[in-house]
Amino acid sequence: MSNTIAVIGATRGTGLAAMRQLIDAGRPAAAVVRSVEKGRALFGDRASVVYGDVTRPETLTEAVDPDWAAIIFTVDITGGIGGRGMFAGRERIRAVMYGGLVNTVEACKQRGFQGRVVLLSTIGLTLPSTGMSILNWIKSGLRDHSLDKAEYLKKSGLDYCIVRAGILNDKTGGAHALSITARDWPLQMGYQIARADLARVLIACATEPTASRRELSVFWAETGHDSDEQLAAKLAALAA
């Protein structure tokens, strides 16, 4: 098995942040993208760029390398240029959010992938809140799609880690310690995290032995910064 970490959803949001951190750290990385041209424009020759569309299973079978150490799956319904349509119908949203993960898992099985799949999810899926109600309305059925894909991954037989993130923002990372717990939390403004900090957690969960077959919630705690050792210790505490 190689040390390569692949990111599916690598050209936007948290997936893009994860790719940049891997590249900046000099770690081998692969971006699975719908637009190879866009991927190469973003990453040049600093990372492997392979074509794969989560709504087209045959492309994932071609894309997945069984020697990858891990796959970080950050695919979501987004708006804007190149997005998949934030206000799309429920079936379209499910095809991307749930179907995309299912297609990825099945491609991994077909290819004999033995690494870990790290799934980005959200806090608040099991706890009622105004925030979740709004998000579930904007992205029709998000709650069910998210719960269903997590269950599918857990029952897949693959190694996994499911990371439930607080409300995302684009602030500079590294300015807060992180709260990492096994329990769910309501989707409220008091539980936020920068995409940069979340990307760091996703990368750690891809390789830390104690993150294997775990579900965790992560958001900012007090002002400060967790060293790599402190982050690893917080993940290890979940297994204690």
Predicted features along the sequence, with ranges:
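Conserved beta-strand positions in the Rossmann-like core of class I SAM-dependent methyltransferases
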Residues: 6, 30-31, 161
